[in-house]
Each structure stands twice: as C-alpha cells, then as structure tokens.
C-alpha cells in the first residue's frame, strides 16, 4: 500500500506543516490527522526536533477519536518517557481511559492532578466530560455552573453548557450562555447562528424576529454559512405567515425569504456545476422551498 507521501507526492516538511495548520485552526479531522501523523511519526520522527512532542499529542487525541488505541498507546508511552511527571501527559492518559470507558480510573487520575494543582482547569473539565458521557446531564450542568463562577471567561465551558441546556430543552438558559459567548466574541458567526437557532426553536413572534436578525448577522460574518441561510429563509417565512404582523412587516419578510431562497438555489447550483447527480439535489431544494413559499395574499 502506498504511503501518504507517495500517494500525494508530498514531503515530510509539508506533512509536518499540514499538521501544524490543523492544530492552529482547531480542525478535528481525526482520520486525516491519523493518516498523516502516523506516517510522519513512523518514518520521520528523527527529523522533527521538538515538534515531535506536540505531534505525538495531536496524533494521540485523533487516534482516540478513531478507536486506534494501539496508536494512542504508543504516542502516550513516548510522551510519558519524555515528560514523566507532566500533568498534561497525565490528562492524556485519562482521556485514553475515558475512550476505553474506564471512567472510575480516569476520575482517579484527574483527582490526583487536582490534588497537586487545584487550579488545573483541564482536569476539572475532563471530569465534567465524564459526567456527560455517563448521561449525568444534571450533574454536569451543576459542575459547569460552579466552574464558570470561577472561570467566567472560559468560552469552551460556556459553549458546552449551552449544548447541555439544549439537550435538556432549557432554551432560555441555552440562549443566555450563547449571549455570553457573543459578548466576548461578537465576530464568531457560529455563535450567532446557534443563538438564532435557539430563538427559532423557542418560537413566538419576538423570538422569530430575533432569530432572523441573528441568522442575518451570521451571514454577514460568513456568507457561506448555509445553516444561517436556511435559518434566515425559515424565520422570515414564519414571520410573514403570522397573522399578528402588519402588511409592511409581511411584505418585508416575504422579500427576505425570497432573497434567501434565491441564494440557497444559487449555492446548490454552483456547488454541483458539471455534476449530473446535482440536478436531483437542486430540484429537491427548489421543491422544498416552493412548498414553504409565502405569498402576499
């Protein structure tokens, strides 16, 4: 079987740089990381210098995602040999135990880290992840709220708490979490989109108007956000269909929905240009939009 470097005609430096790019941009493309990283480690480890250690960590986490315990274990052993007393490496060992569903053992490991360093936020958040994995949502919510009282600026924790509230159908609290995220990072289109989705789910005219506003803001920040585009179409359509709105509001929202529908159709046509199978996709989208169409009558 051909190696990655042979298959794609890339050098080891290009493979190393690709892994760095994925790290910096927080890509969770685990299968690709395993493919590139495993070859880089096996064939070029001696050339990587100090980069090898962060690559071991990156590949190990990806290997856990891909159920490659053999690769995760070998990366972990290299890290343990180099950093035998590192809390960061202990946390990685705990993550492997989580992947094996050995939650009690993982908790003991995280507790030992917290005993040495009570301010270790990573270990504390891993314990919350275990509660989620065990289906203990109420306990996870309580622990996250306590954590955020101390570390109010932790965006990852706010986002995780919003997801937990959504899973529990507590949309008002989920919206509050996302509002906190938008205040600290107003240019993140995903936060705007997710907030809009929560408001849309809550329903009611006021929430639908907020949903439309934030779907539009998400599109302003990233005009390729298709979820936001569909969301804008749906929220504007529902507002236009409401018997509570004035003729002007209805007219405006019919216009917004028509614009969104045109953009959706155009995006599908552009994405599948030259592909026969795309004709069916475009037709399905057009039929879906037609079935939801709001008229001026």
From Swiss-Prot:
Membrane topology listed for this record: Peripheral membrane protein
TPR repeat ranges per the UniProt record: 87-120, 155-188, 192-225
Any one Gene Ontology BP term: protein insertion into ER membrane by stop-transfer membrane-anchor sequence
Intrachain disulfide bonds: none
GO cellular component entries: cytoplasm; EMC complex; endoplasmic reticulum; endoplasmic reticulum membrane; extrinsic component of endoplasmic reticulum membrane
InterPro entries: EMC2-like, TPR-like_helical_dom_sf, TPR_EMC2, TPR_rpt
Compartment(s) of residence: Endoplasmic reticulum membrane
Main location: endoplasmic reticulum
UniProtKB keywords: Endoplasmic reticulum, Membrane, Repeat, TPR repeat
Any Pfam family the entry gives: TPR_EMC2
Similarity annotation: Belongs to the EMC2 family.
Function: Part of the endoplasmic reticulum membrane protein complex (EMC) that enables the energy-independent insertion into endoplasmic reticulum membranes of newly synthesized membrane proteins. Preferentially accommodates proteins with transmembrane domains that are weakly hydrophobic or contain destabilizing features such as charged and aromatic residues. Involved in the cotranslational insertion of multi-pass membrane proteins in which stop-transfer membrane-anchor sequences become ER membrane spanning helices.
Subunit organization: Component of the ER membrane protein complex (EMC).
Record protein name field: ER membrane protein complex subunit 2
Species annotation: Danio rerio (Zebrafish)
